[in-house]
Amino acid sequence: MIESILILSKTGIIRFIKIYSSNDENLNKSELVNNILINIQKSEDTQIIYDFPYINNEKRKLVYKSFGGIYLILIIDECENELASLDFINVIMKVLDEIFKGVCEIHMIMNPDKLYFLIDEMICGGMVIETNKEDIIKNYNDKMKFDDVNYKYFSK
C-alpha cells in the first residue's frame, strides 16, 4: 500500500502531499520532509531507501525519483514492490508532463486542483487503480470539458 505521496522542491518545499495511512494525526510534516531530504542526500546511488522511519518510527520503504527541480516520492509499506513503485512514478510524471506540456515546479504551485484530480485518478485509498496514461488523460479532458460547460452555464 502507498502510505504517502509527496512532491517536493529540491530545497524541501512541499508542493504536493497526500497521506493515505490512517494514523496521520501523529505526523509532523516538516519533520517528515527533513527526514526525507536527509535520507535522499545520504543515498545518492539509489532511488529506494529501506527502513525509512515513518509515523511513530514505523519502518517503511521510500521510493523516489528526481525530475528537474522536483522530487516525486512514494512512501510504501513492506508489501509493495519497489520496482513497480518506480515504474508508477514514471507513469505519474508522463501524465503530468503531457497535461502541463513540460511539467515543472510552477505547474504544481499554479494548478493544485488539477494535480489532486490526476493523482486521485491513479491512486485511491493508497492503492494504485489506474496506470494507463491514455485513460487518465481522457478522464482529465472529459472533466475539463464538463467544468467548462458548467462555468459557461452558471456564469450567465
Residue positions per predicted region:
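Acidic, low-complexity cytosolic segments
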Residues: 1-156
